[in-house]
Amino acid sequence: MIEPRSVVELLQTLVRIPSVNPHGDPGTEGVGEGEIADWLALFLIGLGAKVELREVLPGRPNVVARWPAPGKPRLLFAPHTDTVSVGGMTIDPFGGEVRDGRVWGRGASDTKGPMAAMLWALRESRERLTQLSHEIWFAGLMSEETDQHGSRALAAQERFDFVIAAEPTGLDVVYAHKGSAFFNLTTRGRAGHASRPDLGDNAIAKMLDVLAVIRTEFAAEFAQQRDPVLGASTLSIGTIRGGTKTNVIPDTCEASVDMRFVPAHYQPEIIQRFHRRLEQVCPGIEVSAIPAPPLYTDPAHPLIAKLGECGAQPIGAPWFCDACYFAERGMPAVALGPGSIEQAHTRDEWIAVADLEKGVDFFRRFLARL
C-alpha cells in the first residue's frame, strides 16, 4: 500500500475506496465494506495495532484494532466504514478531489473525514498509545447507514469504558439523541372495477383510516413528550403508495411512518401499543418496525470533561448513530468529529481541509490528556 503523507491524502485514499451500503439503490457496483476494511487493517497494523477482521455479514466485516494495555479501562474510537448511495451525485463520488479548500466525494463528511482525523491523530500519537490511562481501541464499523449491524455486533462482543462514534458534529460532543422507530405498514383488500366499489375492498381507504388514527391519537401523545435538550418526540408519515389505475379498486397500499422518541419516552411498550391499535383499526394490517434506542450519557462524565477541555461543547442531536447501541448496553458513548452534518448524504459532499486538520489537532490533544 502507498502510505499517505497527510490527513488529506489519507481521506482521499478512503474516499477513493467505494464502500457504499448495498441496501436499496446504491447507485454503483462498488458496494460493501470489505475492500476498505482490508485497507484499514494494513494501515492499523502499520501503527502497531493488533487487528482483526470480524465478519458480520458475508464479505462485510468490522475492522477491530487495539493497542494492548491489559488492565486499563478501554476507550473506543468508532467511525463507520459504509456510505449512503452515490446515485444522483453531481461530482465524482470516488474522486477525492481537493478543490477550493475542500475534499470532495461520498463519505468525505459522513464519515470518512472524521475517521481520517481520528486515524491521523492515532498515527501521530502511536509511540505513546500504550502508555495512556486507557487501552485504545479503533473499530471501523460496517452498515451504520442501514440497520447498524456493525455496532450492534461489536457492542454484544466487547465491553468499553467510553466510546466515541465518529460523526460530523463540528467537534462538539453529542451526548444525547432521540431514539427512533421506522414503521412499514401494508393494508390489503380486493381489486375490482371502480364502477362497482361494493364488489371490491379498497386497501387505500383502509390505510387512510389507519393514518387518521396515527395523526390524531399518536401525534398528540408525541407532542406532549418533551426533553429540555432534544425538544419533543416527533411522528411523521413519510411515504404512501397504492393503486395502479384510477378505475381499479386498489388491493394493496403501503405507507411508512418515522417516529423519534426523546429518551424518557422511548419504551418497547409504545411500539407494541402502536401495533395493537392499528390492528384494531384495520384487522390484518401488516406492520414491521426497525427500532433504534436513544442515546444519553451523563454530560458530567470525566471523559466528556476532557473533551470539553479540548473545546467540545456538549449538545444534543435530532439524528441517531452507532453510539446508541453501546449506550443501550450500559457503555458511556458519545458522537464527535469534524465537519458538518449538513454535508452528509448530499449530492456534492465535501469537508473543509481546515476542519479536517482541526479534527486531527482535537483528537491529538484529547489523547495527550489521557
Model segments located where?
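Short, surface-exposed alpha-helical segments at coil->helix boundaries
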Residues: 8, 30, 34-38, 115, ...
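Metal-dependent amide/peptide-bond hydrolase catalytic core
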Residues: 1-2, 52-57, 175, 182-370
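Residue-level signal for inorganic ion chemistry
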Residues: 14, 18, 44, 167, ...
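Fold-level recognition of mixed alpha/beta catalytic cores in primary-metabolism enzymes, strongest
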Residues: 100-103, 109, 113-216, 345-358
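Acidic/His- and Gly-rich active-site-bordering loop/insert found
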Residues: 2-108, 127-132, 340
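Hydrophobic/aromatic beta-strand patches that form the interior of the parallel beta-sheet core
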Residues: 75-77, 139, 162-164, 332-334
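Short acidic loop-to-helix transition motifs that present clustered carboxylates
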Residues: 58-60, 147, 170-171, 320
